[in-house]
């Protein structure tokens, strides 16, 4: 849709002839209907911009001010909301920690990753190792020296 400024419309006004069957009331009704639709659309999404700086103005927040009391001597004190009081040290009870006795079975992880099995050298629990016999090694060394 082409948009014109007011100056351009005033320049085009005398040159453009008005049609003889032009209905001004119907034209004004269409304009009013479009305005209503635009207002409804703006109201629909107005709650999203509640705290934004709309029209470059800061939002106004209501802050509760503390009450100021002045005594006979001229001293002013601020009365704020009462603080939540804690129990004294003697009244405090330490929370008791209960540890449940559980038995867990641990299986050796045979898979390094989920897609392929581990190498046989990596699995120590399944492969029995040969015990080293020191006496057998000493006997074999002595026999070689005697020859």
Swiss-Prot record:
One Pfam family, short name: CAF20
Keyword Hydrolase (UniProt): no
Example GO molecular function: eukaryotic initiation factor 4E binding
GO BP term, example: negative regulation of translation
Domain of life, per lineage: Eukaryota
GO cellular component, as recorded: cytoplasm
Chain residue ranges for the region called Disordered: 41-76
Protein localization: Cytoplasm
Keyword Magnesium: no
Positions with biased composition (Basic residues): 48-66
Keyword annotations of the record: Cytoplasm, Initiation factor, Phosphoprotein, Protein biosynthesis, Protein synthesis inhibitor, Translation regulation
Main location class: cytoplasm
Function: Acts as an inhibitor of cap-dependent translation. Competes with eIF4G1 and EAP1 for binding to eIF4E and interferes with the formation of the eIF4F complex, inhibiting translation and stabilizing mRNA.
Family statement: Belongs to the CAF20 family.
Protein name: Cap-associated protein CAF20
Organism of derivation: Kluyveromyces lactis (strain ATCC 8585 / CBS 2359 / DSM 70799 / NBRC 1267 / NRRL Y-1140 / WM37) (Yeast)
């Amino acid at each position: 849709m082409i948009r014109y400024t007011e100056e351009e419309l005033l320049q085009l006004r005398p040159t453009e002839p008005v049609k003889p069957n032009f209905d001004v009331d119907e034209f004004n009704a269409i304009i009013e209907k479009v305005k209503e639709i635009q207002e409804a659309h703006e109201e629909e999404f107005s709650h999203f911009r509640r705290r934004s700086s709309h029209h470059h103005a800061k939002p106004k927040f209501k802050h509760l001010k503390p009450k100021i009391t002045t005594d006979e001597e001229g001293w002013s004190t601020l009365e704020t909301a009462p603080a939540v009081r804690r129990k004294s040290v003697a009244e405090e009870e330490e929370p008791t920690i209960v540890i449940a006795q559980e038995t867990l079975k641990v299986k050796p992880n045979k898979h390094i990753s989920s897609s392929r099995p581990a190498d046989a050298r990596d699995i120590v629990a399944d492969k029995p190792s040969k015990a080293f016999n020191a006496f057998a090694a000493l006997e074999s060394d002595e026999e070689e020296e005697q020859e």
